[in-house]
Amino acid sequence: MASLPITPESANLSNITGHFQTGQGPCPRLTIYPIVRAGPGYYGDRGDICLSESSTAGAGFLSDVCRDWEAAALPAEDAGIRVVHLRIGVIISRNGGALPQMLTPFKLGVGGRIGSGRQFWSWVTLEDVVGAIHHVIDNETVRGAVNCVAPEPVTNNDFTKTLGAALGRPSVFPMPAFAARLALGQMANDLLLSSTRVFPRRLESSGYDFLQPNLAHALETEINAR
């Protein structure tokens, strides 16, 4: 969800309750567990508040989509099936997601913060997304909401400065909030300008060791990979 545009039309995909209907009673022999992908947008725009899996849902379109998406798995949970709601942050990958879209302006020397730059972005590498999925599948004690984000959320200002440094380019040309809204409408508020300072408490407490916990190293690895 963090790497794809979310629109009111695509939000209808959250109406997937029927796919989780399992009949009456528990299914003790079922060994395939649904992993429901959501995102930190579940928490809404929360400023610099530290957010964990126990934090309440926020308000707004994207928060509503995430909440409805997770609620669609309730029939499976009610049937006794272990369900994991993986709330995946902004994915750092050279092959897709947010990073390739950001590289061009920065390579041209016209990149910079978005809006005030004070909004927190909760990010994660694709390598750790895959690692987290394997971890929650193998660890049967993990269920419910799991924040799949790196343990070091950063402000957009720090993110863009770190990206510029990794490319050896300046990051002094900000995108004003109004320009982001002109380009993306309400999605700018939900995806770029909102602040979600999310921490992966359940992954860490269940023993997952992040492969790329540091943003600078993660960006350098992705940018320099061949």
Predicted regions, residues:
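Conserved Rossmann-fold NAD(P)-dependent oxidoreductase catalytic core, especially the SDR/UDP-sugar
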Residues: M1-G60
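Glycine-rich "substrate-gating" loop/helix at the edge of Rossmann-like oxidoreductase active sites
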Residues: A57-L62, G89-G96, S116-L126, I137
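Conserved beta-loop-beta element that borders a ligand/cofactor-binding pocket
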Residues: A38-G39, A71-R94
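Glycine/proline-rich active-site loop of Rossmann-fold NAD(P)-dependent oxidoreductases
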Residues: G47, C66-R67, A79-I81, I92-Q101, ...
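Mid/C-terminal beta-alpha module of Rossmann-like enzyme folds, strongest
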Residues: N139-Q186, E220-R226
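Alpha-helical substrate-binding/gating segment
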Residues: L103-G112, Q119-V154
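Non-catalytic, hydrophobic alpha-helical segments
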Residues: V129, I133, C148, F159, ...
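C-terminal amphipathic/interface module of NAD(P)-dependent oxidoreductases
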Residues: D190-R226
